[in-house]
């Protein structure tokens, strides 16, 4: 599969990788229907979601692991497309997929992905929801709801121009840091929406 790289090709039971500084770690599971939607697919989504979770803590994402849970009858062609999408997105995000696993369960051809991500946080950088204060500005990176609307449209076979904004946000975060923006807290807004994120900030601070 095109997802392979030097570390994966060693086929060891664990990946030994270089690193320094403080570690940031995250894990996530991805179940989306349909597997392919305007602007992305479950493979791209799994890499972006994991990378962005690391970025939200101020980390520089470095390594990912990937576990596929396949229902019996899963389409091998679709699996290859998903793996290729993951490899491409990982390259764009500057991360390396260093370990993986596959399990097959009873079912009707579904494909699910679990990931773990590791990044390194620069010394002295602290980004936490507890740092939020009354009067802070809240910035959003784009139009809210496009991603879920694109998936729903594909699922319900509704024709429109809505495209998921699924993407690694590293460049955006680095641009703000280089511009001197004082970032207190960040979140990758997912199913809970902006309201849930703001509630989390309020409770934490």
List PLM regions with ranges:
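Helix-biased detector of long, well-ordered alpha-helical tracts
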Residues: 1-205
């Amino acid at each position: 599969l095109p997802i392979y790289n030097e570390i994966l090709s060693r086929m060891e039971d664990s990946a030994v990788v270089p690193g320094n500084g403080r570690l940031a770690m995250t894990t996530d599971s991805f179940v989306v229907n349909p597997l392919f939607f305007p602007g992305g697919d479950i493979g791209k989504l799994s890499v972006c979601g994991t990378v962005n979770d690391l970025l939200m803590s101020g980390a520089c994402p470095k390594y990912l692991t990937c576990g596929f849970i396949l229902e019996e009858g899963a389409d091998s062609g679709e699996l290859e497309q998903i793996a290729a999408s993951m490899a491409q997105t990982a390259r764009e995000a500057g991360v390396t997929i260093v370990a993986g696993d596959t399990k097959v369960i009873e079912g009707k051809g579904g494909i699910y992905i679990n990931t773990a991500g590791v990044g390194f946080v620069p010394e002295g950088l602290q980004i936490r929801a507890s740092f939020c204060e009354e009067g802070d500005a809240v910035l959003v990176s784009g139009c809210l709801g496009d991603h879920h609307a694109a998936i729903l449209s594909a699922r319900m076979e509704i024709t429109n121009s809505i495209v998921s904004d699924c993407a690694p946000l590293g460049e955006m975060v680095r641009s703000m840091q280089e511009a001197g923006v004082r970032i207190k807290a960040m979140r990758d807004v997912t199913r809970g929406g902006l309201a849930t994120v703001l509630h989390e900030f309020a409770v934490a601070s």
